Structure formats: structure tokens, C-alpha cells
Amino acid sequence: EGTQTLLNWLDEAAMPFGIITNGSVIQHRKIERLGLRSRVKCIFVSAEFGHKKPYSGIFRAAAACLDIPCEHILFVGDHPELDIFGANRVGMTTAWLHRGLPWPDTITSVQPDYVIASLGELLPLLRA
């Protein structure tokens, strides 16, 4: 919910963003079908990069591609370990898209900076 509004706002604000995804090159077709290819500055697919999240190098490479320091990036992800732990480890601010699931008791070394139920909840954070 709110995804299209968020994407439109990012376009209007000329705020660059990227995608980091674990998986194969099939992910490119998914990104294309969703109409994101022209909106996304950087796309990192783990099969092409050679390492999967939470490997810190893939997060640093995305930051370099965006030409934004890790400390100035808000990383949004739905997997506590692969996304939130990985991004947090390189100094990114994190937002966990929880999709109705509780934070795992097994992950105590890191917590997300923000917890959201939908991408639309990012707008107030980005506007601040």
C-alpha cells in the first residue's frame, strides 16, 4: 500500500534509489515487469555480484553506485538478517518492512531504526 505514491514522490524529488536482491538474473525480468527499470539508478543481483546479502560488500557497492555515503542511506528490507543486519553493519539507517511478522527472537545484535507495515509509511520519514 502506498507504493505508487512513494515511487511518484521519489521521481518528483529526484531522489535516487537502488535495488539489492538475492537471487538469479531472473530478478531483472521481475524488475522490468514491475516497471522499475527506468526509475532505479542501481540494481545489484547477488548472482551477478558474486555475493549474497548480508555480505557488506554488496551494500557498499550499491552506496558507491548511488554516490551516497552509507550513513546517508535509508535501506528498506523485509528480511531481518539478510536486509536489516547487512545494511546496519555498513552504517545505513534501516526500515524493516515486517509484513505482519514479529521480529525474530534469535536476532538480538541489531534492531531496525524504523518498523513499517507498508512502503507508503516511508513518505513521512523521507520528507523529514
Please report, for each region that a protein language model flagged, where it lies by residue.
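Asp-based, Mg2+/Mn2+-dependent phosphohydrolase catalytic module
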Residues: 4, 8-11, 15-128
